[in-house]
């Protein structure tokens, strides 16, 4: 009598053989992404999911790290945060289709704006669904530096947005709105921030990185359940030497970007990284390297990130994206995802602003 794991292995071998000829005919990642995912594959989880993903496609590699994946999936936002926030449907939208300007095949904000180290800074949201605040603060930091021509290198505080933009932005560590985070920066201002326990800033990140990370101080493990949202404090950390209200920086403009691939590229190339939200499936948590394309696993929630550039690999177009799961996840904290197909909604919820 076969046990459950053996049955799954037999099923994987059978289905891999069954679909082998079909997958051989897949010439591009776009064709692969357009194929319907079998119902049984949507239900796969854990090691069986990773095995299936690595058997079925050559575009990205998945790695089975169950504890890491469990923590990351547990800190995602609920699907509710996909919806446009009530009362905000009049947001300014920019980015008409590009027709007359030539765009390069590849672009990397880290290379163009080398005087802005924030672009290369990978944050760690810890065990809190704060990706919306982290992605917004990260993008704000980059744009502030870029638009000051490298003179202002202040990191915007994700904790200030997370704790004080409530209930306007959403529900703190349970998720929130990228767009409203930008509106908060425009209307109320945001103070300086930095890594957990960082000195010389108003509000460093509230939570320590979970577990051990290569080359980093060990702060301990994180609780099994997500952290409670920190309280909004109208003052800076002890010893900073500056009043909270005097430390604030204000955005001058906030806007969304139409989901035209070339329009998004043009805005990134001219003004810097953008904040984006997309739908996460379980296979994404096991991403190791390559160009991600959803292959199997259940829909698990929403996630917000920062798009810093784009490129092409073996004919496959991709976005280069900074995640907030520390530097030992993915490609040194980054991932690449299929570009130009609105894959997982990555091009459908993009917001940014100016300083």
Model-derived features with residue positions:
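Catalytic-core signature of thiol
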Residues: 4, 8-9, 14-355
């Amino acid at each position: 009598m076969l046990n459950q794991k053996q049955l799954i292995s037999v099923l994987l071998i059978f289905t891999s053989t069954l679909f082998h000829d079909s997958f051989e005919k897949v010439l591009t990642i776009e064709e692969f992404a357009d194929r319907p995912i079998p119902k049984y594959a949507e239900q796969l989880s854990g090691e069986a999911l990773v095995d299936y993903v690595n058997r079925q496609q050559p575009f990205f590699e998945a790695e089975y790290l169950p504890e890491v994946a469990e923590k990351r999936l547990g800190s995602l936002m609920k699907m509710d945060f996909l919806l446009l926030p009530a009362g905000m449907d009049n947001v300014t939208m920019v980015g008409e289709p590009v027709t007359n300007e030539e765009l390069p095949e590849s672009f990397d904000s880290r290379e163009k704006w080398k005087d802005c180290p924030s672009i290369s800074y990978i944050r760690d949201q810890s065990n809190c669904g704060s990706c919306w605040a982290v992605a917004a603060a990260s993008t704000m930091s980059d744009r502030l530096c870029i638009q000051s021509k490298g003179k202002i290198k202040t990191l915007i505080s994700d904790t200030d947005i997370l704790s004080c933009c409530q209930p306007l932005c959403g529900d703190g560590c349970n998720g929130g709105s990228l767009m409203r985070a930008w509106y908060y920066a425009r209307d109320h201002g945001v103070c300086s921030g930095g890594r957990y326990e960082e000195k010389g800033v108003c509000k460093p990140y509230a939570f320590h990185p979970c577990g051990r990370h290569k080359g980093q101080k060990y702060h301990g493990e994180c609780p099994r359940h997500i952290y409670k949202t920190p309280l909004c404090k109208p003052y800076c950390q002890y010893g900073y030497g500056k009043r909270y209200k005097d430390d604030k920086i204000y955005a001058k403009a906030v806007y969304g970007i139409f989901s035209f691939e070339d329009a998004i590229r043009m805005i990134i190339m001219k003004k810097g990284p953008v904040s984006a939200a997309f739908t996460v499936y379980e296979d994404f948590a096991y991403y190791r390297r390559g160009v991600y394309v959803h292959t199997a696993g259940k829909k698990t929630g929403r996630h917000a990130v920062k798009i810093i550039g784009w490129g092409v690999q073996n004919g496959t177009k991709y976005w280069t994206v900074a995640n907030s799961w520390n530097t030992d996840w993915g490609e040194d904290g980054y991932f690449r995802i299929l570009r130009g197909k609105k894959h997982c909604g990555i091009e459908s919820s993009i917001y940014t602003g100016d300083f």
